[in-house]
Every structure is written in structure tokens, then in C-alpha cells.
Amino acid sequence: MRTSRGIAVRANALALAAATAVAVLAGCGSTGKNGVATKSTGAIVATAEDAVVAASSVHIQGQFTSGGEHVVLDLRLVKDKGASGTVTIDDEVIELLRIGPDVYVKGDEQFYRSVVARFGDATGPSPSGSATPTAPHASGSPGASATPKSSASTPGDITVSAMQVNYLHIGPTDAQYQTFASLTDPRQLVQQIMQGVGSLDKDGQKDIRGTKSIVLSGKKDTRVYVAIDGSPWLLRVLPPGGGTLEFLDYDKPVTLNPPPAAQVVDIAKIMK
């Protein structure tokens, strides 16, 4: 016959075992509500990439290294419509806008000098003491309209000061198109960011801006964070070359506005 003392000891042992089991399960982390955490790491990355592409909009902000160049992004991508924001490559700032197939770029003085040196007449005066006009931004972002100016028609007329108050239009048939358009395509941009990531391992969970995510770790401090609740969105990437990319504002309304026609210079005319 069991004594009351024996029953108490057994009950305490069972309670301790139960508490230990709960602690172990908590340490393993939950699989989340969207099931992505149960997949292989390769499948998780592919699912997150598809989620970025499927989103009606996404704001990508941060920096990384690509082809030896330091790239800083602040872009809002809109599904099937285009993108708006800024790209800085090795201290050269470019304001980028794509509406449908048409890409418009506006840069700082260094950017225009490089364009003029390649295609135009670099003898023209450069602006002094004036801030670089700001290209169109997504709604809710600061932006200033440039002073209207007729677009130049021949390379000899193209000067830094003339170009800096205009937008360069780059069409799908122009040689430079893919370079800029790839930055506004969600799948191409994510693949560029993820380039060189290599193999990844599951490395626990982390809360990213209030959303529970699974952490995938790789070489050179690479980290990929994917939401395990709700949509399996890509939330943050620490690429192997250094830097951090944040994926924000999924499915938030974004308005894209084309620049005034009078303020557009066709890059094809400069290259003639």
C-alpha cells in the first residue's frame, strides 16, 4: 500500500518532469502558424522570395555589397507597376523611378558628370550652391519638383547644369535599361541580395518588429529572417558581404507619379 509520503514524492517528480519537458519544448521554439519553419532551409528561402514577389508592395531599406561595390537602397516596389526611391553606389546617389516599362533616373552632380563625360559635352557650367533636385517619391515620402526645363536634343547641348534639373529616361531597348530595371524587380533584387549566401542552417527564432521569425544562419555572419506567423515574408537579411537589408511595409498603399514630360531627357538622344 502506498503511503501519503510516497504519493507526494511521486507527484513532485512528475511535476518536475513536466516542467522540464515544457522548458525543452520552449527552447526548441514553435513551428509558427504558416508552417514555413517545418520546411528545409532552401525551401524557406524560396517561399520567402515568392512572398516578396506576391506582395502588392514592399519597402526595402539598407545596405549591402555587390560586385565589390557598396550599395545603399531605399526603394518601394509596387507589384506590376514599378518602383520609387534612391540607390547609392559607392557614394554616387541615384534617384530611381520605374513606371511600367519606363525607367527614370536623376542623380547627384557626380552621376551627371559621369554621364556627360561618356556621352555629352562636359564643358558646361555646373550648379553652384544649389541642392540637387529631388526625384518623385512614393506617396508619404518627401519630394520636391525640379524647375521645368526643356530637354536637350543633341549631345553638344547636354551639360551638367542642364541635366541636373531633368530626369533621364531609359527605355527597354537602351543598353543601360537592365542595370536599373533589375533594382526595381522584386525577384531579381532579392536574388541579387541573396547572391553568395550559400548553405544555411536553422538557428532558432527571433522577434523582428513584432513578428516572430525563424533565423537561418550561414557563413560570414549571414542571417536570413523569415516570418513564421501570417505570410512567410522575408523580414531581414544580413548578406555575406556585410550590411543589413530590412523588408518593411508589406502591402502598404504606394502611389507612383511620372515626372513632367518637359523635364525628361531621353538617354538615347545623349548616346547619338
Question: What does each of the following model-derived ranges do?
Answer:
Residues 1-16:
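Bacterial N-terminal signal peptides that target proteins for export
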Residues 29-272:
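Subset-of-secretome marker
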